[in-house]
Amino acid sequence: MSAEIICVGTELLLGDIVNTNVQFLAKELANLGIPHYYQTVVGDNPTRLREVITIASKRASILLFTGGLGPTPDDLTTETIAQCFHSPLVEKAEIIEDIQDKFKARGRQMNENNRKQALIPKGATILPNPTGTAPGIIWEPIPNVTIMTFPGVPSEMKRMWSETAVPHLKSQGWGKEVIFSRMLRFRGIGESSLATKVNRFFNLTNPTVAPYASLGEVRLRISAKTASETEANAIIEPVAQEIIKIAGEDYFGQDDDTLGKVVGELLRQKQQTVSVAESCTGGGLGAMFTEIAGSSDYFWGGVIAYDNCVKMSLLEVSAEALDHHGAVSDIVAQQMALGIKKRLETDWGMSITGIAGPGGGTDIKPVGLVYIGIADPDGNVESVECTFGDRSRDIIRYLSSCTALDQLRRKLI
């Protein structure tokens, strides 16, 4: 028994719309403990849609459709499903009445085209749409195959799913065992290196452990299928603790933890403060601190020192350092960190200076070269050289800010 998600709409194939529906439904199926192995996107073409339905109905027992329920000629989902299973369409008076009421509430009259939305396969149950004019259906056209259809509008689909579809699935016995997951997050280690360290955990069956790589970090998802969250935690916790111990300082948090949140908590625990001096990141590092509510407890402010004159006047970077080493150098990064620490009288001072591109690089100092400076409460200062490569400007700036936060985190733990 498994589910398959079928998203209908040429706009999805063309990339005009981001398919958030499939992400939502995939997570919901996992939460209900319903396995699903296939996701299909098909355009508004009845021939190709029939092919998809024919294949899906042979390999899945729950078919979830989104899109193609509107009143226009290219909205063909319902009638194509009916054709596949040789069922006539019947007009439902209660659907027409509901659509008319919704138009009336908006001071409008229902268009005759909307009558199309009242046609459903004979024997199907209406899946009500509380907000829109496109209802869905719940239908078992053949034994062991249940079809559910939803409009493509995400807000409408989500409400129909939670209010009607989920209770129906639970009444059929689904959801007795659900999947609970915990995401462990790591910085400063590559996916392959982490996978090598924790390779033995990938053979587990309950819980399962799977790696995910994302920009600036690696994640491990630990998932358990149980009847309750308490049981899941009892299974997940020992595995999580073993992995955290193996990863050491490269582990920084779990689930919704961000570097900014984790570093902020460490500063708060130590009752210490921090300030930042930024060049190429243009405030990105400060933004990561201040996106956390209550960050004024430990983050006192920063200076965006883009021009060398600002570096000298506000951060006391020496003209000699700029002349002899250049703005992008370890010496300047160190002086910037000390300068902001002194000016704002914080325990920690941080700095970032680099070449974010796309221009400005040389053979000696290429695009992606970044220096991060950190001055500690005792007045000691260090700098780290980073080479992010010739990547996009946004990525270099983002990785620079993340790396700076991670460097401070490692000094605080």
Curated annotation (Swiss-Prot):
InterPro entries: CinA, CinA-like_C, CinA_C, CinA_KH, Competence-induced_CinA, MoaB/Mog-like_dom_sf, MoaB/Mog_dom. Coiled coil: none annotated. Pfam families: CinA (PF02464), CinA_KH (PF18146), MoCF_biosynth (PF00994). Gene3D superfamilies: 3.30.70.2860, CinA-like, MoaB/Mog-like domain. It comes from the Bacteria. PANTHER family: NICOTINAMIDE-NUCLEOTIDE AMIDOHYDROLASE PNCC (PTHR13939), NMN AMIDOHYDROLASE-LIKE PROTEIN YFAY (PTHR13939:SF0). Belongs to the CinA family. This is CinA-like protein. It comes from Crocosphaera subtropica (strain ATCC 51142 / BH68). The lineage of its organism: Bacteria, Bacillati, Cyanobacteriota, Cyanophyceae, Oscillatoriophycideae.
